Amino acid sequence: YALLRSLVGSEMCIRDSPVPVACEVVQAIQTLVTRQFSVFEPVVATVGRIQAGTTNNVIPETAELDITLRSLSGDTRERLASGVCNLIEQIPVAHGLQGEVKLKRGYPPTINHAAGAEVVAKAAKALLGEEGYRLMPDPFMASEDFSYLLQRYNGAFAFLGVAPPGTEGKAAPCHSNHMLVDEDAMAVGVAMHAAIVLTCLNGSV
């Protein structure tokens, strides 16, 4: 969360607006991602909300930005957060404004263990057949509290397909207001949990 605050008086002719400064901060964050991080070190910096003012003929006192940062490692996450905080604090100063950061640390990166992922794969193939298991081609920046468990224990975070039949490739994502869930998939999810437990107990991995 970032707050850009005007420091000048109330006369519009001499008051700097935080709106263009907020836009500059947004652009600088995108440049930070592409210039300070390797393409082999994926990061995401999303400005999901900008709020400033209440009408079109009054210069607002403040501009607020809500920003989400994600990465595939803890070290990269810290570098990204540090870089974004520096931009928010320094760019407004060049315009006579003040930038404040309220950093709320979310969940750490969700990183599977190879052994845990192998258990899930074996259980899924045994329960659903080879066609019922699919390895994701690229890493997914999941933000999950399960990541805390993965920091301490061997395990894996897996997805359960819940798209209604006949909608593969066309179904809305789970965070969409158009999402439709095949409720029969819940039975598959329960069976998968049981299959994973049995796979571990049988010592097949």
Residue ranges and their predicted role:
Residues 1-9, 13-14:
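Single conserved hydrophobic/aromatic residue that forms the stacking wall/gate
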Residues 19-205:
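Metal-dependent amide/peptide-bond hydrolase catalytic core
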